[in-house]
Amino acid sequence: MIYIDNRQNKIKAQEDLDKLINEIIDYALKKEEVDIGYEISVIYVDNEIIKEINNDTRGINKETDVLSFPMLEYPKGRVFSESYREYSFGVEYLNEGNLVLGDIVLSLEKALEQSKEYNHSFLREVCYLVVHSVLHLLGYDHIDEEEKVIMRKKEEEILESFNISRG
């Protein structure tokens, strides 16, 4: 189950964007071997709100494009498919039988700015940010170069499956 909550009014969120985000998240989770019903919340915000959340949660007082709040903990360098595939989750991890993977907070305002900066579509930018964030919910990171290469490759593979590419 994917919940999309639009908490901003600066960028008009299209129904077809929500549909595509649902499809991409579902595809990414299947590709990453999430073999249980799941719950993810995607919250659209503006730059002001994401700046406040970024400051409150990370101590960084500036706007960003997307924030990921995973509900599961992962050993360093391990991801969902290595840590939790076929795992028997306790009720504290479930909501109505679905595994709560976490929340994605996405600034549509920042996504629009970045799409112009990188000279590609708003749709491509939003989809990239969602895929990036979903991979964080599944334990991927990009702190060291080796992890970054793996994560970038996964992002591009997922986007290419939807014919979404740079440019």
From Swiss-Prot:
Keywords: Cytoplasm, Endonuclease, Hydrolase, Metal-binding, Nuclease, Ribosome biogenesis, rRNA processing, Zinc. It is found in: Cytoplasm. Its EC number is 3.1.-.-. Binds 1 zinc ion. It is an enzyme of class 3 (hydrolase). Zn(2+) binds at residues 132, 136, 142. GO terms for molecular function: metalloendopeptidase activity; RNA endonuclease activity; zinc ion binding. Its main location: cytoplasm. Its cofactor is Zn(2+). It comes from the Bacteria. One of its GO terms (cellular component) is cytoplasm. InterPro entries: MetalPrtase_cat_dom_sf_prd (IPR023091), YbeY (IPR002036), YbeY_CS (IPR020549). SUPFAM superfamilies: Metalloproteases ('zincins'), catalytic domain (SSF55486). GO terms for biological process: rRNA processing. Single strand-specific metallo-endoribonuclease involved in late-stage 70S ribosome quality control and in maturation of the 3' terminus of the 16S rRNA. PANTHER family: ENDORIBONUCLEASE YBEY, CHLOROPLASTIC. Belongs to the endoribonuclease YbeY family. This is Endoribonuclease YbeY. It comes from Clostridium tetani (strain Massachusetts / E88).
